[in-house]
Amino acid sequence: DGATGLGDQLMPGKSDAAWLAAFGARRLMAYMRDGALPQEAVSAALFDAQTSFEALRKRPPADTWETPFSSMMFVAEDAQGVEALWFGDCAALVKRADAPVEIVGDALERRQNEARRVAKLAEKHGLSPAAGVNRPEYLEALRKARNFVNTNGHWAFGPDVRAADHVSSKRIEAAKGTVLLLCSDGFLALASDYNAYDGDALVAAAQAKGLKALCEELRAIEKNDLEGKKFPRFKTSDDATALLLRVR
């Protein structure tokens, strides 16, 4: 899930965020198909991202905030269950038989912190919370925060191979029939921000309604709160991506 750009685009394509998300996903899957272990795939994909970024960018970033970064939730099944590796605020919701949903990742805490930050900035500058990340009043704070990425524990997927040593990981017990809902923070907002579901209800709805219906529900909530006054956020809508899996 590529982080929204905060300045000039440096890479070819639709956006730097879109380039990194697509590039990273392709490289991770390619290395897994070649037999790499999950940690090896992450390390190699980061190396490739750094190499490609340095070769194709229009110019070097003037500061860290110009560098493309993304969140990631990467899961791989093996004989012991499922291994999850992640950066940032993507999440994996794990539903086992007769057990509550387990949320893997740091997304809930990060979303809550962001909502508080948005509300505080909006009040300070007299803006609607969802005025947009390109507002000068927001850009300064967002760029300052982005400059801390890949320092002091704030690591993300990006063109920096050093991040491989800081990827979060968890071994997930996943017996046959276990359901996993992988999602970006924009999709998880149904539970983390908009209180339309809790974790269990969101996984159940994904199975009963399908992901497309949930995305439509998500956009309807956002459409009814365009200024972000009920649900503070930097943008009216964020990218929402989800994948529903079942262990066989």
Q: Residue ranges of each PLM-predicted region?
A:
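PP2C/PPM-type serine/threonine phosphatase catalytic domain
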Residues: 2-248
